[in-house]
Amino acid sequence: MNISIISVGKIKEKFLKAAIDEYSKRLSKYCKLNIIEVADEKTPDNASLKEENIIKEKEGNLILKHIKDNSFVIALDLKGKSITSEEFSDLIENCRLTGNSTIAFVIGGSLGLSQQVLSRANYKLSFSKMTFPHQLFRVMLLEQVYRAFRILCREPYHK
C-alpha cells in the first residue's frame, strides 16, 4: 500500500523531525510512505476573509499538484468525521480491499484547506474539535497510521 502525506509548511523543530523519522521507519514494514511538504503562504496580520481564501487557494493548488488521479484522498478537517482508531484502521483496510492502494492524507496550513482540496477529498476526517499546530499534527497522523496497521495485523500496541 502507498501512503502519501501532503502537508503545508516545513517542519523546523528537531523533536518533531525525530518523531516523524521514527514513525516513518516503523511504517516501512507496512507501507510505502511518501511525505510531501508544500510551501506555506505568509498570512498577514489581520488578513481579510478574502485574503485568507486567496492564501488557501494558492496552498490548495500546490497540494492538488501532488495528488494522483487514482488516490483515495483523506482531508484532515475540523468539520470532518471523528472516528476511533479501530474505525480508522477499517477505513485503511476498506481502501485496500476496494482497490485503492494509494491513500493521500492532506493536512492544510494554519488557515485550513481550500474548497478545491475539500471537494477532491473522498473522505473528510477530524481528529478532534480542538485545533492543533499543523506541524505537530503530522506526527499525530503518522502515529495513528502506524497504530492502524498494527491493529490490522493484529499486533499488540499500547492503548
UniProtKB/Swiss-Prot annotation:
Catalytic function, reaction form: pseudouridine(1915) in 23S rRNA + S-adenosyl-L-methionine = N(3)-methylpseudouridine(1915) in 23S rRNA + S-adenosyl-L-homocysteine + H(+)
Localization in the cell: Cytoplasm
EC number: 2.1.1.177
Keywords carried by this UniProt record: Cytoplasm, Methyltransferase, rRNA processing, S-adenosyl-L-methionine, Transferase
Subunit structure: Homodimer.
Family: Belongs to the RNA methyltransferase RlmH family.
Protein name as it appears in the record: Ribosomal RNA large subunit methyltransferase H
Species per Swiss-Prot/TrEMBL record: Clostridium botulinum (strain Hall / ATCC 3502 / NCTC 13319 / Type A)
